[in-house]
Regions:
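Bacterial N-terminal signal peptides that target proteins for export
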Residues: 1-2
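A Zn2+-metalloprotease active-site environment signal
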Residues: 8, 14-242
Length: 242
């Protein structure tokens, strides 16, 4: 559809500036990028993010705890997932399209194991449902990186410099999910807890804790409305009888 729109604008002879054509060209380029290319770009982007953050040492209590909780999930639901801890006072967790899930130490400090498992399940849901892929596609389409990547792509992969990767990561991690995406990811996390026979009440407790943080940034910036989400999970528990 985008290609047809570009062609019709070119042939009408109307007052179409080169800037408008460049923008439409960018839209077409972004739309033509494959999921596998975006996942590879996401992997590069996440590697840059790991380099910019303090990743917990494998022998630290945080890394050991996360590994204990997540080893069973590395191939969950046909996905290829990896998990790391960022040592940070920010309460946060996020996932990117390549299957990288990052949990911040401050979040781990405030959550029990079962509560943390729900948060992790929620993030896995964003990967499985394609929400993380949607985020990077939109961020890529709206960033200057699209020209840099198009100009330097080789062998089918998109190649970006560090500054472009950092800018793309910032856009991706700070973009809000829709209410439906959040609800679906919550439901996924809840189902995952039931699958492994974890205490589902911990999902409600986790969301209530996040809700008490208010709009203080971190996880609340991209995952809002935790209060109503807690009520929705409680309704699922009541429906299922446990």
């Amino acid at each position: 559809m985008v290609l047809i729109a570009v062609a019709s604008l070119v042939t009408t002879g109307g007052c179409i500036t080169s800037g408008h054509l460049d923008g439409l060209g960018d839209m077409y380029t972004a739309a033509s990028i494959t999921d596998s290319q975006l996942k590879e770009l996401s992997r590069q982007m996440r590697a840059e993010g790991d380099a910019q953050n303090e990743v917990a040492d494998a022998n630290s209590k945080y890394a050991k705890r996360l590994a204990r909780l997540t080893d069973r999930f590395r191939k969950e639901d046909g996905l290829d997932l990896n998990f790391k801890v960022y040592m940070s006072k920010t309460v946060n967790a996020n996932a990117t399209a390549d299957g990288s899930i990052r949990v911040y130490s401050a979040l781990m400090d405030m959550m029990t194991d079962n509560e943390l498992l729900f948060i992790i399940g929620h993030e896995i849901g964003h990967v499985k449902d394609g929400d993380s892929l949607d985020k990077i596609r939109m961020a890529y389409a709206s960033s200057g990186a699209i020209k840099a990547a198009s100009a330097s792509s080789a062998g089918g992969n998109l190649v970006l410099g560090r500054s472009d990767l950092q800018g793309l990561l910032h856009k991706v991690l700070n973009a809000q999910f829709s209410q439906k995406q959040e609800s679906d990811a919550d439901a996924y996390g809840y189902r995952l807890m039931r699958k492994y026979k974890f205490d589902t009440k911990a999902a409600v407790a986790a969301l209530e804790k996040l809700n008490r943080l208010g709009s203080s940034g971190g996880v609340m910036a991209s995952h809002p409305n935790s209060g109503s989400r807690a009520s929705a999970i409680q309704a699922m528990i009541d429906r299922d009888g446990k």
